C-alpha cells in the first residue's frame, strides 16, 4: 500500500492506494479523508502546512508487541508554529478513514514559529528530524534545524525503537 498525507487547513488529508498487481502497479485509491479535531486526528490549528509521514518498526512498551508506528509531523499551531509529531499504531490494512482518526500526541519539537518538516529513521533507530524554525513570524525567514529524537521521547515512553 501507499499512504498519501496532504496538507489542508486545520489538519491533514489521508488517502491509501492498494495494489491489486505489483507487477503492473495496478490498484485502487480509497477516498481522501480529513484528519483533524473532530476525529481525534492530526490537528494543525489555523494553518495548512507541509509535513512528513513516516512508518517505523517499534515495540509497544506495555504489551511488548512488535508494531508498525505511523509518525506525522505538522505545525501544531496556532498558525505556523510549534512543529510537532503525532503517532499511531497501524497494521497496513487501514482504510483512509481508519488512518485519519484517533492519533496520539502530539510531541512538540519546538514552541517557536516553525513550518515545513521532514524525517527519516537512522541506522541507530533514532528519528532524524529536519524543520524550519524562526524567532518571529515577522522576520519572513526560517533557519533550518536538525534534531535527533528517540521514539520513546516522541511517544512519551509508550513505544521504543525495535
Model-based region annotation:
Residues 1-49, 55-112, 123-126, 131-162:
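Beta-rich carbohydrate-recognition and catalytic domains
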Residues 53, 117-119:
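Hydrophobic core register within WD40 beta-propeller blades
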Amino acid at each position: 500500500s501507499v499512504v498519501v498525507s496532504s496538507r489542508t487547513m486545520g489538519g491533514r488529508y489521508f488517502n491509501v492506494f492498494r495494489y491489486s498487481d505489483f507487477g503492473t502497479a495496478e490498484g485502487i485509491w480509497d477516498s481522501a479523508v480529513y484528519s483533524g479535531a473532530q476525529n481525534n486526528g492530526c490537528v494543525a490549528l489555523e494553518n495548512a502546512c507541509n509535513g512528513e509521514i513516516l512508518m517505523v518498526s517499534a515495540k509497544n512498551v506495555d504489551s511488548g508487541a512488535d508494531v508498525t508506528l505511523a509518525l506525522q509531523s505538522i505545525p501544531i499551531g496556532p498558525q505556523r508554529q510549534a512543529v510537532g509529531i503525532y503517532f499511531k499504531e497501524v497494521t497496513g490494512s487501514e482504510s483512509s478513514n481508519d488512518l485519519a482518526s484517533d492519533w496520539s500526541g502530539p510531541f512538540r519539537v519546538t514552541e517557536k514559529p516553525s513550518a515545513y518538516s521532514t524525517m527519516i529513521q537512522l541506522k541507530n533507530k533514532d528519528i532524524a528530524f529536519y524543520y524550519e524554525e524562526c524567532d518571529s513570524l515577522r522576520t519572513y525567514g526560517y533557519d533550518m534545524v536538525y534534531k535527533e529524537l528517540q521514539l520513546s521521547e516522541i511517544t512519551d515512553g509508550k513505544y521504543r525503537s525495535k
